[in-house]
Amino acid sequence: HPICEYLEQLEWDGQERIRYVLQRYMGADASDFVYEVVKHFLMEALSRIYRPGCKADEMLCLVGQQGAGKSTFFRFLALNDDWFSDDLKQLNDSKIYEHLRGHWIMEMSEMIAAISAKSNEEIKSFLTRQKDTYRNPYDKYEEDRKRQCIFAGSTNTRQFIPFDRTGA
């Protein structure tokens, strides 16, 4: 896998960066909670590349003003522009599964895809799926494809997902 190959050729210089990445680039608090959230998000990203189809149920959502660098931050984490996409507009788009292929971090910019979903259940079902079953154009049969991407969200407002009574 090209992302695995890229990651495995990197050498760590001993500098701790994960603990302070959101503080440095997004102005977040330097709390243990923020550190754990970022660490968990990055561990899910790595897991999806090394173990396609593994559980990755959470989505890191950044809230901030227009131009705060939310999308730039996620693009930076993807390491390569080809491994990032912010073009996820609707969860019910027939070509969505083709679009997921080849991308590592899929940003729901301004949470448009989530807002356009019919319900929280539809959002949860889409985000927590471990594989997608679809037929490529001109193929005869559908195939199961294990997910290798994770999802990230960005919005300018804190009111981006409808209230969920289940708490999940």
Model-identified regions with their sequence ranges:
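P-loop NTPase catalytic core of nucleic-acid-dependent motor ATPases
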Residues: 1-105
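Terminal, non-catalytic protein-protein interaction segments that mediate quaternary/complex assembly
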Residues: 4, 76, 119-125
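Conserved nucleotide-binding/hydrolysis micro-motifs of P-loop NTPases
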Residues: 112-113, 156-160
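A short helix-turn-beta junction within AAA+ P-loop NTPase domains corresponding to the substrate/partner-engaging
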Residues: 161-168
